């Protein structure tokens, strides 16, 4: 999905020739320590321009380099599950969770089929998150 990082007034995103020229800087040419180098700095991450998931990311601590994690980011902790892609943004997700909690709801079977039996909105999977982050280069 399309996404962007917004640090101050500067936007960083994937290069896309169809997007407005000069709108964003190429995210592949920058490292996090260059654009958010200090503790307490914050920036926004917008994921999926259709659903428009906005995340405020705050640099809470800067750790010394660890040879085990060279070349990719590492998540140290988190809360709750990621909403599924293309669920209609925050309001669509809230609607899904409401349907999920009511087996008598007419859309219950469809929502459960989409989410799968394993989905638990209250569980954050740190190991899975870091496996995904490991693939980012």
Residue spans of the language-model regions?
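Short linear regulatory motifs enriched in tryptophan with gly/pro/ser
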Residues: 1-137
């Amino acid at each position: 999905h399309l996404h962007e990082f917004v640090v101050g007034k500067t936007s960083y995103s994937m290069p896309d020739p169809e997007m407005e020229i000069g709108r964003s800087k190429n995210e592949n040419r920058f490292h996090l320590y260059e654009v958010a180098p200090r503790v307490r700095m914050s920036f926004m991450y917008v994921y999926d321009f259709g659903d428009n998931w906005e995340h405020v990311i705050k640099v809470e601590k800067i750790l010394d380099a660890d040879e085990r994690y060279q070349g990719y980011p590492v998540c140290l902790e988190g809360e709750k599950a990621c909403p599924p892609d293309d669920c209609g943004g925050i309001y669509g997700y809230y609607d899904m969770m409401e349907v999920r909690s009511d087996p008598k709801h007419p859309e219950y079977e469809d929502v459960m089929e989409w989410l799968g039996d394993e989905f638990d909105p209250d569980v954050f999977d740190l190991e899975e998150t870091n496996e995904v982050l490991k693939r980012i280069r």
